[in-house]
Protein backbone atom coordinates (compact mmCIF):
# COMPACT_ATOMS: atom_id res chain seq x y z
CA UNK A 1 0.00 0.00 0.00
CA UNK A 2 1.38 3.39 -0.98
CA UNK A 3 0.65 5.29 2.26
CA UNK A 4 2.35 8.61 1.20
CA UNK A 5 -0.32 9.11 -1.43
CA UNK A 6 -2.79 9.58 1.43
CA UNK A 7 -0.81 12.36 3.09
CA UNK A 8 -3.00 15.44 3.48
CA UNK A 9 -2.22 19.12 3.38
CA UNK A 10 -3.78 21.27 6.08
CA UNK A 11 -4.10 25.02 5.75
CA UNK A 12 -4.83 27.68 8.34
CA UNK A 13 -8.49 28.32 8.96
CA UNK A 14 -7.89 31.66 10.68
CA UNK A 15 -6.28 34.92 9.63
CA UNK A 16 -4.03 36.86 11.99
CA UNK A 17 -3.18 40.53 11.60
CA UNK A 18 0.46 41.29 12.31
CA UNK A 19 1.62 43.72 14.98
CA UNK A 20 0.40 47.25 14.45
CA UNK A 21 -1.34 50.13 16.19
CA UNK A 22 -4.97 49.19 15.86
CA UNK A 23 -6.63 52.41 14.82
CA UNK A 24 -6.54 55.85 16.41
CA UNK A 25 -5.44 56.29 20.00
CA UNK A 26 -5.55 60.09 20.04
CA UNK A 27 -8.92 60.90 18.48
CA UNK A 28 -10.71 60.94 21.82
CA UNK A 29 -8.09 63.23 23.40
CA UNK A 30 -8.93 66.21 21.15
CA UNK A 31 -12.08 68.08 20.18
CA UNK A 32 -14.05 66.68 17.25
CA UNK A 33 -16.03 68.61 14.66
CA UNK A 34 -17.90 67.43 11.61
CA UNK A 35 -17.37 69.63 8.55
CA UNK A 36 -19.20 69.67 5.21
CA UNK A 37 -18.76 71.43 1.90
CA UNK A 38 -15.63 73.48 2.42
CA UNK A 39 -12.03 73.40 1.21
CA UNK A 40 -11.10 75.00 4.54
CA UNK A 41 -13.11 75.50 7.69
CA UNK A 42 -13.26 77.54 10.88
CA UNK A 43 -13.92 75.22 13.83
CA UNK A 44 -14.54 78.09 16.25
CA UNK A 45 -14.45 81.90 16.42
CA UNK A 46 -12.38 83.10 19.36
CA UNK A 47 -12.67 86.11 21.68
CA UNK A 48 -9.56 87.19 23.55
CA UNK A 49 -8.81 88.41 27.04
CA UNK A 50 -10.35 91.64 28.33
CA UNK A 51 -9.91 93.44 31.65
CA UNK A 52 -12.34 95.54 33.66
CA UNK A 53 -11.59 99.27 34.04
CA UNK A 54 -11.82 100.86 37.46
CA UNK A 55 -14.00 103.97 37.66
CA UNK A 56 -12.29 106.84 39.49
CA UNK A 57 -14.78 109.65 38.75
CA UNK A 58 -18.53 110.10 38.58
CA UNK A 59 -20.33 109.96 35.24
CA UNK A 60 -17.27 109.39 33.02
CA UNK A 61 -17.87 108.97 29.27
CA UNK A 62 -18.31 105.38 28.11
CA UNK A 63 -15.38 104.31 25.99
CA UNK A 64 -15.93 101.14 23.95
CA UNK A 65 -13.31 98.46 24.38
CA UNK A 66 -11.44 96.81 21.53
CA UNK A 67 -11.94 93.13 22.27
CA UNK A 68 -9.35 90.97 20.50
CA UNK A 69 -10.71 88.23 18.25
CA UNK A 70 -9.19 85.42 16.24
CA UNK A 71 -10.24 82.71 13.83
CA UNK A 72 -8.30 79.44 13.45
CA UNK A 73 -8.49 77.58 10.14
CA UNK A 74 -8.40 73.87 9.47
CA UNK A 75 -7.54 72.24 6.14
CA UNK A 76 -8.46 68.73 4.97
CA UNK A 77 -6.21 65.90 3.86
CA UNK A 78 -7.51 62.94 1.85
CA UNK A 79 -6.50 59.37 2.64
CA UNK A 80 -7.42 56.03 1.16
CA UNK A 81 -6.35 52.39 0.95
CA UNK A 82 -7.48 49.47 -1.17
CA UNK A 83 -6.72 45.88 -2.07
CA UNK A 84 -8.25 43.19 -4.25
CA UNK A 85 -9.33 39.64 -3.52
CA UNK A 86 -9.34 37.63 -6.75
CA UNK A 87 -12.10 35.08 -7.21
CA UNK A 88 -9.58 32.40 -8.18
CA UNK A 89 -7.63 33.09 -4.98
CA UNK A 90 -10.77 32.58 -2.88
CA UNK A 91 -11.12 29.11 -4.40
CA UNK A 92 -7.71 28.15 -3.02
CA UNK A 93 -7.97 29.38 0.57
CA UNK A 94 -9.93 28.06 3.52
CA UNK A 95 -10.75 31.47 4.98
CA UNK A 96 -12.01 34.43 2.98
CA UNK A 97 -9.58 37.32 3.72
CA UNK A 98 -12.03 40.09 2.78
CA UNK A 99 -13.14 41.03 6.29
CA UNK A 100 -9.58 40.90 7.61
CA UNK A 101 -8.46 43.24 4.84
CA UNK A 102 -11.27 45.65 5.71
CA UNK A 103 -10.19 45.59 9.36
CA UNK A 104 -6.56 46.19 8.42
CA UNK A 105 -7.53 49.13 6.21
CA UNK A 106 -9.62 50.64 9.00
CA UNK A 107 -6.68 50.37 11.39
CA UNK A 108 -4.48 52.13 8.83
CA UNK A 109 -6.95 55.00 8.51
CA UNK A 110 -7.08 55.37 12.29
CA UNK A 111 -3.30 55.67 12.38
CA UNK A 112 -3.56 58.29 9.65
CA UNK A 113 -5.81 60.34 11.93
CA UNK A 114 -3.19 60.16 14.69
CA UNK A 115 -0.46 61.23 12.27
CA UNK A 116 -2.57 64.22 11.21
CA UNK A 117 -3.11 65.21 14.85
CA UNK A 118 0.60 64.89 15.69
CA UNK A 119 1.76 66.68 12.54
CA UNK A 120 -0.54 69.64 13.01
CA UNK A 121 0.17 69.84 16.72
CA UNK A 122 3.62 71.21 15.93
CA UNK A 123 3.03 72.71 12.47
CA UNK A 124 2.40 76.36 11.67
CA UNK A 125 -1.30 77.11 11.88
CA UNK A 126 -3.37 79.62 9.95
CA UNK A 127 -5.50 82.24 11.67
CA UNK A 128 -7.26 85.50 10.82
CA UNK A 129 -10.27 86.47 8.73
CA UNK A 130 -9.11 84.54 5.67
CA UNK A 131 -6.36 82.45 7.23
CA UNK A 132 -3.67 84.92 6.20
CA UNK A 133 -1.80 84.94 9.52
CA UNK A 134 0.71 82.21 10.34
CA UNK A 135 1.28 81.21 13.95
CA UNK A 136 4.21 78.94 14.82
CA UNK A 137 4.55 76.72 17.85
CA UNK A 138 5.98 79.04 20.54
CA UNK A 139 9.39 78.40 22.05
CA UNK A 140 7.97 79.38 25.44
CA UNK A 141 5.81 76.25 25.38
CA UNK A 142 8.77 73.93 24.87
CA UNK A 143 10.47 72.05 27.71
CA UNK A 144 14.16 71.58 26.95
CA UNK A 145 15.72 68.15 26.65
CA UNK A 146 18.01 68.90 29.61
CA UNK A 147 15.35 70.50 31.82
CA UNK A 148 15.97 69.77 35.50
CA UNK A 149 19.16 67.82 34.79
CA UNK A 150 22.84 68.38 34.11
CA UNK A 151 22.58 66.70 30.73
CA UNK A 152 20.07 65.57 28.13
CA UNK A 153 17.50 63.21 29.63
CA UNK A 154 14.33 61.39 28.71
CA UNK A 155 10.93 61.90 30.26
CA UNK A 156 11.17 62.82 33.94
CA UNK A 157 8.82 63.87 36.69
CA UNK A 158 10.49 67.29 36.60
CA UNK A 159 9.49 67.72 32.95
CA UNK A 160 5.93 66.65 33.64
CA UNK A 161 5.72 69.08 36.54
CA UNK A 162 6.97 71.87 34.28
CA UNK A 163 4.37 70.99 31.64
CA UNK A 164 1.66 71.19 34.27
CA UNK A 165 3.06 74.48 35.58
CA UNK A 166 2.96 76.03 32.11
CA UNK A 167 -0.66 75.03 31.66
CA UNK A 168 -1.70 76.27 35.09
CA UNK A 169 0.18 79.56 34.64
CA UNK A 170 -1.84 80.15 31.48
CA UNK A 171 -5.09 79.65 33.44
CA UNK A 172 -5.91 76.34 31.79
CA UNK A 173 -8.73 74.72 33.77
CA UNK A 174 -7.22 71.32 34.50
CA UNK A 175 -10.19 70.35 36.65
CA UNK A 176 -12.62 70.31 33.73
CA UNK A 177 -10.36 70.09 30.67
CA UNK A 178 -8.77 66.61 30.36
CA UNK A 179 -4.97 66.73 29.99
CA UNK A 180 -3.03 64.21 27.89
CA UNK A 181 0.66 63.38 27.55
CA UNK A 182 1.62 61.31 24.51
CA UNK A 183 4.62 59.00 24.89
CA UNK A 184 6.41 56.22 23.08
CA UNK A 185 7.52 53.02 24.80
CA UNK A 186 10.84 54.71 25.62
CA UNK A 187 9.28 57.59 27.56
CA UNK A 188 6.99 55.16 29.37
CA UNK A 189 10.04 53.16 30.38
CA UNK A 190 11.69 56.38 31.61
CA UNK A 191 8.80 56.86 34.03
CA UNK A 192 9.18 53.33 35.39
CA UNK A 193 12.60 54.44 36.67
CA UNK A 194 11.12 57.41 38.53
CA UNK A 195 10.54 56.57 42.18
CA UNK A 196 7.89 59.29 42.43
CA UNK A 197 5.85 57.44 39.82
CA UNK A 198 6.09 53.84 40.99
CA UNK A 199 6.23 54.26 44.78
CA UNK A 200 3.05 54.37 46.84
CA UNK A 201 4.92 56.64 49.25
CA UNK A 202 4.31 59.46 46.74
CA UNK A 203 0.86 58.46 45.49
CA UNK A 204 -2.43 58.00 47.32
CA UNK A 205 -3.33 55.20 44.91
CA UNK A 206 -1.35 53.22 42.32
CA UNK A 207 -0.69 55.02 39.04
CA UNK A 208 0.09 51.79 37.20
CA UNK A 209 -2.43 49.33 35.82
CA UNK A 210 -0.88 45.94 35.05
CA UNK A 211 2.54 47.51 34.66
CA UNK A 212 1.34 50.45 32.55
CA UNK A 213 1.46 54.04 33.77
CA UNK A 214 -1.95 55.34 32.77
CA UNK A 215 -2.17 58.62 34.68
CA UNK A 216 0.24 60.82 36.62
CA UNK A 217 0.27 64.46 37.75
CA UNK A 218 -3.14 64.95 36.19
CA UNK A 219 -2.06 63.75 32.73
CA UNK A 220 -3.63 60.77 31.02
CA UNK A 221 -0.79 58.96 29.28
CA UNK A 222 -1.36 57.72 25.74
CA UNK A 223 1.14 55.46 24.03
CA UNK A 224 1.95 55.55 20.33
CA UNK A 225 5.09 54.92 18.31
CA UNK A 226 4.02 57.53 15.74
CA UNK A 227 5.65 60.50 17.51
CA UNK A 228 8.20 62.38 15.43
CA UNK A 229 11.67 63.55 16.40
CA UNK A 230 13.21 67.00 15.91
CA UNK A 231 16.32 67.78 13.88
CA UNK A 232 18.45 66.71 16.85
CA UNK A 233 16.64 63.33 16.90
CA UNK A 234 15.03 64.11 20.25
CA UNK A 235 11.48 62.87 20.70
CA UNK A 236 8.73 65.51 20.65
CA UNK A 237 6.07 64.57 23.20
CA UNK A 238 2.83 66.59 23.18
CA UNK A 239 1.24 67.54 26.50
CA UNK A 240 -2.10 69.31 26.08
CA UNK A 241 -5.70 69.68 27.11
CA UNK A 242 -8.59 68.52 24.98
CA UNK A 243 -9.88 72.01 24.14
CA UNK A 244 -6.51 73.01 22.68
CA UNK A 245 -6.69 70.82 19.57
CA UNK A 246 -9.44 69.95 17.11
CA UNK A 247 -9.86 67.12 14.63
CA UNK A 248 -12.08 68.24 11.77
CA UNK A 249 -13.91 65.50 9.91
CA UNK A 250 -15.02 66.09 6.34
CA UNK A 251 -15.56 62.36 5.82
CA UNK A 252 -15.06 59.84 8.58
CA UNK A 253 -13.50 56.44 7.94
CA UNK A 254 -15.67 54.74 5.32
CA UNK A 255 -15.33 51.17 4.04
CA UNK A 256 -16.69 49.95 0.71
CA UNK A 257 -16.55 46.29 -0.29
CA UNK A 258 -17.71 45.75 -3.85
CA UNK A 259 -17.11 43.68 -6.95
CA UNK A 260 -14.88 45.08 -9.70
CA UNK A 261 -16.65 44.19 -12.93
CA UNK A 262 -14.00 45.98 -14.99
CA UNK A 263 -11.29 43.46 -14.04
CA UNK A 264 -10.86 39.85 -15.08
CA UNK A 265 -12.02 37.37 -12.48
CA UNK A 266 -14.47 39.90 -11.05
CA UNK A 267 -12.39 40.42 -7.89
CA UNK A 268 -13.71 41.89 -4.67
CA UNK A 269 -12.26 45.32 -3.90
CA UNK A 270 -11.83 46.47 -0.32
CA UNK A 271 -11.66 50.27 -0.34
CA UNK A 272 -11.27 52.42 2.77
CA UNK A 273 -11.17 56.22 2.63
CA UNK A 274 -11.54 59.37 4.70
CA UNK A 275 -10.95 63.13 4.69
CA UNK A 276 -9.91 64.98 7.83
CA UNK A 277 -7.60 67.66 9.22
CA UNK A 278 -6.46 69.06 12.55
CA UNK A 279 -5.18 72.28 14.04
CA UNK A 280 -4.17 73.85 17.32
CA UNK A 281 -6.77 76.18 18.78
CA UNK A 282 -4.68 77.95 21.41
CA UNK A 283 -0.94 77.74 21.93
CA UNK A 284 -1.09 78.21 25.70
CA UNK A 285 -2.98 74.94 25.97
CA UNK A 286 -0.18 73.02 24.27
CA UNK A 287 3.27 72.01 25.53
CA UNK A 288 6.14 70.22 23.82
CA UNK A 289 8.20 67.96 26.09
CA UNK A 290 11.52 67.20 24.39
CA UNK A 291 13.04 63.87 25.41
CA UNK A 292 16.35 62.16 24.73
CA UNK A 293 16.32 58.47 23.86
Label the predicted regions.
Residues 44, 68-133, 171-185, 221, ...:
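Long, contiguous amphipathic alpha-helices that act as assembly "spine/axial" helices in icosahedral shell
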Residues 130-205:
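Extended, solvent-exposed, turn-rich assembly/linker loops in the middle of proteins
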Amino acid sequence: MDIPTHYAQQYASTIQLLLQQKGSRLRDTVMFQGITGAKAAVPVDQIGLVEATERTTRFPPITPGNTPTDRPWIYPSDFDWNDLVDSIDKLRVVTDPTSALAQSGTYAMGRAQDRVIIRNYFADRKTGVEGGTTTSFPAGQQIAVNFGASGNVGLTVAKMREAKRLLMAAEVDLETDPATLIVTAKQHDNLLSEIQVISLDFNEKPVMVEGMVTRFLGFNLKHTELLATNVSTYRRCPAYVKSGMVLGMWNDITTDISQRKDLAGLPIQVYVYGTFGATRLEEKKMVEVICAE
